[in-house]
Structure formats: structure tokens, C-alpha cells
């Protein structure tokens, strides 16, 4: 069973190509025009062990918002497509990940029901500008990214920032925690021969 997908998404604001392989090794080729976001998506690929290609050409002369959002939408769509009917997966994933002073818990349920709960970021985190290139990545985009991925990927996602002071660490730890939780949730369980739901469908 090959769990791969390719999504192409084009609007008046961006053109996005996303390719994923859920059974990869974390190989990545990411270019969105937003340097910090590239760094975060690379971390996601590496720690989820998902092979990930992202090529986005967006209206970064305005700001990063459309580019970041549209990439997240396409990534969610690709993850959903690659999962297929979800036969044989573990379904649930729970990871708590540190990065120096930052600590984040992420929990995933590949339920087919989109939901995202995002809590715990310190006051002012949403206004922080991150990255050494223009346009900067605004801290408020992090919640928006996870909401977009969860809603278009059709899974429930809870992200709780438990500790953190350095804004870069706070964002990066979230991406790594979500990656590890997702990795566990989509892993194939040799004892699960069907779809992991009493309803028979996810």
C-alpha cells in the first residue's frame, strides 16, 4: 500500500505544490518564500518521518499570510489524501516535546472530524515577528497553520504550550510535537486489520 499524495492548489494569491509520502524517512524539499516557515515545515517532515516537497509561489510582496495559509491548506489536503481510508493506522498520537525552556504537548486523532484546540502561548507571542528574511513570520500564524492543516486533513488536533520564553523555541516545539504525534497516529499497527473505529469508517 502506497501512502502518497500530490496536491496542486492555485488562487489569485498563491500557487502551491505539495507532495507527501507518509512512509518516508523525513526527506524534505521546502520552499515557500518565507524562511522561518520553511524551517518549521522542514522540522515537521523530519520528526514526522514524512517525505515532504513544498513549492509555493505567493504574494509575499504583501506579507506572509496568504502564502503560509495556502501552503497549510494544501498540506492538510495532501495528508488526508495520502491516508486513504485509514485502514490499519493507530489513529491516535500523543507527544510531549521539549526544546530547552519550551515544552509542548500535541495530541492527534485521525477521526475524520476536523477540530483544532490551540492553547497556552504566552501573552504577546502572536505579535512576534520571526525570521531573518522578508516577509517575516508573524507569531499569530502558528495557530492558523494548525487549524488549516487539521481542518483540511480531517483530524482533531490539540496543541498545548506548557512552557516557553523564547518565541522561536515556542513555535518550533509546537511543530515538532505535532509531527511526533502525527507520526504515531498514522503509523501502521500490525494488529489492526481494519479501520480503527467501531463505526467502520473514519
UniProtKB/Swiss-Prot annotation:
> Which keywords does UniProt give here?
Amino-acid biosynthesis, Cytoplasm, Histidine biosynthesis, Lyase
Q: Where in the cell is it found?
A: Cytoplasm
**Top-level class of the enzyme under EC nomenclature:** lyase
Question: Hey, which pathway is this one from?
Answer: Amino-acid biosynthesis; L-histidine biosynthesis; L-histidine from 5-phospho-alpha-D-ribose 1-diphosphate: step 6/9
Give a GO cellular-component term: cytoplasm
TM spans (from-to): none
The Gene Ontology biological process annotation of the record reads:
L-histidine biosynthetic process
Read off the CDD domains from this record.
Answer: IGPD
UniProt catalytic activity: D-erythro-1-(imidazol-4-yl)glycerol 3-phosphate = 3-(imidazol-4-yl)-2-oxopropyl phosphate + H2O
UniProt lists the family membership as follows: Belongs to the imidazoleglycerol-phosphate dehydratase family.
- Protein name, entry field: Imidazoleglycerol-phosphate dehydratase
State the species of origin: Nocardioides sp. (strain ATCC BAA-499 / JS614)
Which gene holds the coding sequence for this protein? hisB
Amino acid at each position: 500500500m502506497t501512502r502518497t499524495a500530490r496536491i496542486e492548489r492555485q488562487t489569485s494569491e498563491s500557487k502551491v505544490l505539495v507532495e507527501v509520502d507518509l512512509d518516508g524517512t523525513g526527506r524534505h524539499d521546502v520552499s515557500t518564500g518565507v524562511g522561518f516557515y520553511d524551517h518549521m515545515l522542514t522540522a515537521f517532515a523530519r520528526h514526522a518521518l514524512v517525505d515532504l516537497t513544498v513549492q509555493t509561489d505567493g504574494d509575499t510582496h504583501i506579507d506572509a499570510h496568504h502564502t503560509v495559509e495556502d501552503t497549510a491548506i494544501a498540506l492538510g489536503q495532501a495528508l488526508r489524501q495520502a491516508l486513504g481510508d485509514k485502514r490499519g493506522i493507530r489513529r491516535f498520537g500523543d507527544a510531549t516535546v521539549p526544546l530547552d525552556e519550551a515544552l509542548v504537548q500535541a495530541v492527534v486523532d485521525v477521526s475524520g472530524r476536523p477540530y483544532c484546540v490551540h492553547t497556552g502561548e504566552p501573552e504577546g507571542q502572536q505579535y512576534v515577528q520571526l525570521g531573518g528574511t522578508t516577509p517575516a513570520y508573524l507569531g499569530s500564524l502558528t495557530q492558523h497553520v494548525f487549524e488549516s492543516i487539521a481542518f483540511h486533513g480531517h483530524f482533531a488536533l490539540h496543541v498545548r504550550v506548557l512552557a516557553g520564553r523564547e518565541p522561536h523555541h515556542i513555535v518550533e516545539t509546537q511543530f515538532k510535537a505535532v509531527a511526533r504525534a502525527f507520526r504515531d497516529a498514522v503509523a501502521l499497527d500490525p494488529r489492526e486489520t481494519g479501520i480503527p473505529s467501531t463505526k467502520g469508517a473514519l
